[in-house]
Amino acid sequence: MFQRLITGIALFSLAAIAQADNHTNAWRGVNLDQQFGIQFEVCQLKPGKTLDDMAKLNDEVRRLFDETGLALSLMRLTPMYSHGMPGEPAASYIDVTMGTIEAFGTGWDNWLASKDAVKLMAASDKIATCTFKFARAINRVAQIEALDSTDDRLISMNWCSKRDNVSWDQLKTKHDAWQAAYENDSSSMAWNVVLPRLGAGNAHGRFMHMVSYANAQQLMANENWVANGGSARALGDYYSAYAACDGESVWSASYLYKNEG
């Protein structure tokens, strides 16, 4: 991630959402200067079911997003480097929905009022068991041109807990310093900090760094920077002094629906 970032630190961002607006820092209907909503639908395929079975519902998903007027964007993430271990499988896939917090309120009301949408959810339930998690996201960096150039990307996620002897203001100051160094000198496309809210469970009080990469070359350029470019010391300082983190997982992501607002 953060190639050449202030002594080289690494780790953050999801693909925000952005179609350039000449007057505000906005992308795909979201003001990136404000916290926005991110919903994670974490899914485990049922025995005998595959991602191909779920993909057969994709056209209906797109139709209903249009029909119900959802001002939201939807990506499907499948594991590339997951935390899953033998006997402890990771999620089969995660559907990530992004938009303004207000759009989630209107969107859920419209979705649940649609008989076809309820029918679609029932069809999905026959293929996978899913749980919904709603979070807020703070965009730190969005390379708009790069984000708009492709519907596919790799996304890293790293869950962290603030160290007890560090205040939230001190942690924010650290992130501010990274952002200042990162914005114009990075091989990744986006960095968001995610704050779990509804359905958070034991993730309450934690935060997640999400970073988006255009391809594996960008991802491995960051890994090379960590290994050979001097970033390891800065990462070690962050982990020991500021936050205890689980380590990064990496997911392959593709848009199912893009809000063009």
For each feature predicted by the language model, list its residue ranges.
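Short S/T/G/P-rich N-terminal loop/turn motif that feeds into the first structured element of a domain
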Residues: 19-261
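N-terminal signal peptide c-region/cleavage motif recognized by signal peptidases
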Residues: 13-18
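Bacterial N-terminal signal peptides that target proteins for export
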Residues: 1-9
